[in-house]
């Protein structure tokens, strides 16, 4: 009984975490001021280029800062 209860509780918690991480609105409606929009930031980091961009070739802006490969 305890094992089934704990397994069920674990599945509910993992399901909640997965659902919380999924975006509910369209990617085009993403607000850049909200840091939880990770997919928006990831897309912007690989596609957006600024005029006075200090990044060297092979560097990308991410929510975690500038990452160079």
Curated annotation (Swiss-Prot):
Places the protein is found: Secreted; Nematocyst
Chain positions listed as propeptide in the UniProt record: 22-57
Keyword Disulfide bond: yes
Summary of the tissues where the protein is detected: Tentacle (ecto and/or endoderm tissue), and possibly also nematoblasts.
Cystine pairings recorded for this chain: 59-68
Keywords: Disulfide bond, Nematocyst, Secreted, Signal
UniProt keyword annotation of Translocase present: no
UniProt GO cellular component terms: extracellular region; nematocyst
Coiled coil: none
Signal sequence, renumbered to the chain: 1-21
Domain of life: Eukaryota
Comment field (misc): Shows a propensity to bind albumin in aqueous solution, which opens up the possibility of using it as a carrier for directing albumin binding as well as potentially increasing half-life in serum. The peptide is found in two different conformations which could be explained by a cis-trans isomerization at Pro-63.
Function: Peptide with unknown function. Has a limited effect on human peripheral blood mononuclear cells. Does not show activity against both Gram-positive and Gram-negative bacteria nor is it active on the 26 voltage-gated ion channels tested.
Protein name per its UniProtKB record: Peptide Hact-1
């Amino acid at each position: 009984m305890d094992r089934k209860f704990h397994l069920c509780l674990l599945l509910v918690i993992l399901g909640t975490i997965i659902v919380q991480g999924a975006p509910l609105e369209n990617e085009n409606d993403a607000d850049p001021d909200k840091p939880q929009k990770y997919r928006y930031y990831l897309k912007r980091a690989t596609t957006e280029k600024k005029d006075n961009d200090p990044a060297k070739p092979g560097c990308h802006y991410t929510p975690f800062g500038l990452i160079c490969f």
